Amino acid sequence: MKYLFINSSKDKAGINIRNNLEKLNNINNNCIIDFFETPKKLTELSKKDLPQDYDYYIFLSKHRSVSEKPTLTVHTSGNLTTDNSHGGNIEEVCCCDAILNTILLVNINKYNNLEKYKKLGFDVSFEAIHHAPTDLDVPSVFVEIGSSEKEWAIDEAGEIMANAIIDTISSIESKSYKKLDKVIAFGGGHYAPRFTKLSLSNKCFVGYIIPKYAKISEKVLQQLIQMQDFDYILFDWKGINSEDKKRYIEFFDKNNILWKKVKDLCY
């Protein structure tokens, strides 16, 4: 497999992660790993800006939030609605690999819980789909250090992310991971606490996450089921508006797509 690590020269967190990746000498020799740095913001990129012929794009990025809570996050990019204020095309999502996203999250959490890193006080979570790029047709994922300029420059945070990325690639290349169902997740807030918990408990592989606040069209629903390999749809049942839930279920039933509730996995 061929992996491209992408960072912006304007992004301190991305540079931090890249510098730590370049220090590692335990990279799997059976795969090809390349680096690509752009002067653009990552949210300004599209397919035409990136080298082609890669199997995976891994974006090394900062995360910003109003709370400035120290957080390490994972998500696939895209615009679920007609709001493209953070770049990309409206109602368009990048290709997603639930196995890649979830193993990344699990490995980030593993390193974050080591004694040498616990003092940093980072949370670990998924994020819902958001921002550009939106037009990438190979699996793409953002790994982000947040949520303020202080955290972006913490070298140990870059170490956590770099080690997690390399461990993830090693697992994918060797297929040395537990086989779990792959899901597309609907409901809950932006940081998807229930889906984060399920993934960290090894209940399933979570790919796309569609939050409660995104009322997505049938056009986007079609993209989701075409752009990610999945076994079924997973609903955070109380984390979705009833009207949206009804509309989504009608679409999935019409297309003979299996769906389940989060509580079905909480055994």
Curated annotation (Swiss-Prot):
Official protein name in the record: D-aminoacyl-tRNA deacylase
Enzyme Commission number(s) of this protein: 3.1.1.96
Pfam families per record: tRNA_deacylase
Keywords recorded for this protein, A-Z: Hydrolase, Metal-binding, Zinc
GO molecular-function term, one example from the UniProt record: zinc ion binding
Protein family (similarity comment): Belongs to the DtdA deacylase family.
Gene3D superfamilies recorded: AF0625-like (3.40.630.50)
GO BP, sorted A to Z: D-amino acid catabolic process
PANTHER family: D-AMINOACYL-TRNA DEACYLASE (PTHR34667:SF1)
UniProt organism field: Methanococcus aeolicus (strain ATCC BAA-1280 / DSM 17508 / OCM 812 / Nankai-3)
Catalytic activity: a D-aminoacyl-tRNA + H2O = a tRNA + a D-alpha-amino acid + H(+); glycyl-tRNA(Ala) + H2O = tRNA(Ala) + glycine + H(+)
Protein function: D-aminoacyl-tRNA deacylase with broad substrate specificity. By recycling D-aminoacyl-tRNA to D-amino acids and free tRNA molecules, this enzyme counteracts the toxicity associated with the formation of D-aminoacyl-tRNA entities in vivo.
Keyword NAD found: no
Cofactor binding summary note: Binds 2 Zn(2+) ions per subunit.
Cofactors: Zn(2+)
UniProt xrefs under SUPFAM superfamilies: AF0625-like
Top-level taxon of the source organism: Archaea
Subunit record text: Monomer.
